A protein has these predicted regions:
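Paired acidic/hydrophobic, glycine-rich loop segments that form the ligand-binding mouth/hinge
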Residues: 123-127, 328-333
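Ligand-binding "clamshell"
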Residues: 135-148, 340-362
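General small-molecule cofactor/ligand-binding pocket signal
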Residues: 97-103, 308-309, 352-354
């Protein structure tokens, strides 16, 4: 295997808003650029100072012709042409339409990727995981940005991170890709208000069942069972369950299980579990957290706590259920957006973290160097379109572009008071209710028109120079003050901490792990085949085990799964991944 010896720090989490767009349907086949004339001709030119002090001018960019951008995006939960309020902003500024090609919802993402790569045109804009980007650079599918990127002032703010990542591509001398979720806060900081994944439930319901101390996941399940027994339906009379799952985010394993492994100090990476102690073990290790948390879901189902729709529903259905309070356990921090509001907090009904004493949370640090995905321009685009795409990317990294991505639009979503941003009522409710967008801003429902790219160049924790506060709405001083409610005050009084981050750190229940953004070894043809076959087995078996008939059936299915994997070359795959992640662990040790 061939590894680059450079490592940099990055975040492996996905920021709060990055998962809020639901899955969609619709054709996302490659479209040709059209040449319809707009009513007015717009040209832009930018003059900037490069890192060397030389003045460089960006060529004039004409927006005279409409440009439909084929956007291949592994982060997207929507497939088709962006619509609604975000579409209007992009169309008005750049005369562009974004045709999002989403392997995650295409039915067969691997086949889509291979087909488009073979055709020599993956997309005009491309978001990929690091390893796939490395492969595409070597295949000639990615446009060289080396000679132009310094001309773009907003991208240039992150030149340290951009150069660090690109030093791992090719011979390290050129710039091809821009890391995503970067910030300027420093490489080892964790400045989020909440941990990324942890048990969360309604404060009112937790107190209603006696606010029990939770020593382990058995106690957590018993608490949830009491809540579901008291509330088998929501206020509308719809059935409600402690736990609801969805499978359309699954990749090589059951994603819902993989997120919960972090509660017990391990993160799933390919076929292996990487621990807070820098250990690596196979995902199939019975002493590992994947087995433990898969069994947690099985035990929950045996107790009648798992939504029977889980095996068939998609993310859209899940969102609807959260908005109607039909799900009693959350784990992602960003799920708060589908229910919590300051008003509900004053009623004491917001969801909030509930400590489980035996957890040791695997929490990655903030995303200084990027999160493991990158954005690039396809090599097949014309010179004219290349200039337009670079202009768009620079805006996407600008304070205006970042503010729109993380905070929405002024007037509808927030107002400006004394130089600070304050969420409106619609802003507070934009993910939990139907917020109508005025026709002159694009019309429709706000959430439906949200940015379907679903990843950002700049993370929400970065500082907006216009306010000297983070871009993320939950980190605005006005929002923090609004969220100081009956719920948070009672929680702090009970647990003796200002928030979950403070509580978990103080009680040695959380380890902040330096995130590593490194171009890892690319799968060989044989390993790629083994990974696909093993991934299909793991996903199928994991879902079946959640609904196993009894303990004996669960154990038999686990053993059958591991036997099947061994016959497919599992040992070779885990050996490959163990070596693959070795440089990442060495870089992590150096950063600790």
């Amino acid at each position: 295997m061939k590894f680059k010896k450079f490592a940099s720090l990055a975040l492996s989490t996905v920021m709060a808003a990055s998962m809020l767009a639901g899955c969609g349907s619709g054709a996302a086949e490659s479209t040709e650029t059209t040449s319809n004339q707009t009513e007015t001709k717009t040209e832009t030119a930018t003059t900037t100072e490069t890192a060397s002090g030389d003045t460089a001018a960006v060529s004039e960019v004409s927006h005279d012709s409409e440009y439909t951008v084929d956007f291949y995006d592994v982060a997207a939960n929507f497939q088709g042409v962006q619509s609604g309020w975000y579409s209007k902003i992009v169309k008005d500024k750049f005369n562009m339409n974004l045709n999002i090609i989403a392997p995650q919802v295409s039915g067969d993402g691997a086949a889509l990727y291979q087909t488009r790569c073979a055709a020599g045109a993956l997309g005009d804009l491309i978001i990929l995981d690091n390893a796939d980007m490395q492969e595409c650079v070597e295949s000639g599918l990615i446009h060289d940005l080396t000679d132009v990127i310094a001309q773009y002032p907003n991208l240039s703010k992150y030149m340290e991170q951009i150069k660090a990542f690109n030093s791992m591509l090719g011979d390290g001398s050129k710039i091809y890709a821009i890391p995503l979720e970067m910030n300027t806060n420093g490489p080892t900081a964790y400045k989020q208000l909440h941990v990324y994944t942890y048990p969360r439930m309604g404060w009112d319901m937790y107190n209603e069942v006696g606010a029990p101390e939770l020593k382990n996941t058995d106690d957590l399940l018993n608490c949830l069972a009491d809540i579901q027994k008291a509330h088998p339906q929501n206020d509308k009379g719809d059935p409600a369950y402690a736990i609801s799952l969805w499978k359309d985010w699954d990749s090589q394993y059951m994603e819902c299980v993989a997120q919960l492994t972090k509660w017990y100090g391990q993160e799933v990476n390919g076929s292996v579990l990487i621990g807070t102690d820098n250990s690596i073990v196979p995902l199939t290790d019975k002493a590992g957290a994947y087995y433990k948390m898969l069994k947690f879901f099985y035990q929950a189902n045996k107790m009648g706590l798992v939504d029977p729709d889980s095996a068939t529903q998609d993310w859209n259905m899940m969102v609807s259920k959260m908005q109607d309070k039909r799900v009693y356990l959350y784990w992602y921090s960003w799920q708060y957006g589908f229910w919590n509001t300051p008003a509900k907090g004053e009623e004491g009904v917001n969801y909030i973290e509930i400590p489980v004493a035996d957890t040791n949370l695997y929490q990655a640090s903030d995303t200084y160097y990027g999160d493991g995905r990158v954005i690039a321009v396809g090599s097949q685009v014309s010179d004219e379109n290349f200039a337009r795409l670079m202009e768009f990317l620079d805006w996407y990294a600008s304070p205006e572009g970042v503010q729109i991505q993380h905070g929405g639009t002024e007037g509808l979503i927030y107002t400006v008071e004394n130089g600070k941003y304050v969420l409106t009522e619609d802003g507070l409710n934009r993910f939990s209710a139907e917020v109508a967008v005025p026709e002159d801003q694009g019309g429709g429902n706000w959430n439906d028109g949200n940015n379907q790219i679903n990843q950002w160049i700049v993370a929400s924790c970065d500082i907006n120079p216009d306010t000297n506060e983070p871009y993320g709405t939950d980190m605005w001083s006005s929002t923090i003050k609004m969220n100081e409610t009956k719920t948070t005050k009672e929680w702090s009084e009970k647990f003796g901490a200002a928030d979950d981050v403070e509580y978990l750190l103080k009680n040695n229940m959380m380890t902040v792990v330096p995130s590593i953004n490194i171009a890892l070894a690319i799968d060989t043809t044989d390993i790629s085949l083994i990974r696909k076959q093993c991934g299909d087995i793991i996903k199928d078996a994991s879902w079946r085990m959640v609904f196993a008939a009894d303990d004996v059936d669960f154990e038999k299915q686990w053993d059958d799964m591991t036997s099947q994997l061994e016959g497919l070359g599992w040992a070779d795959l885990t050996a490959f991944d163990t070596e693959k992640y070795g440089p990442m662990l060495e870089a992590r040790k150096a950063a600790q």
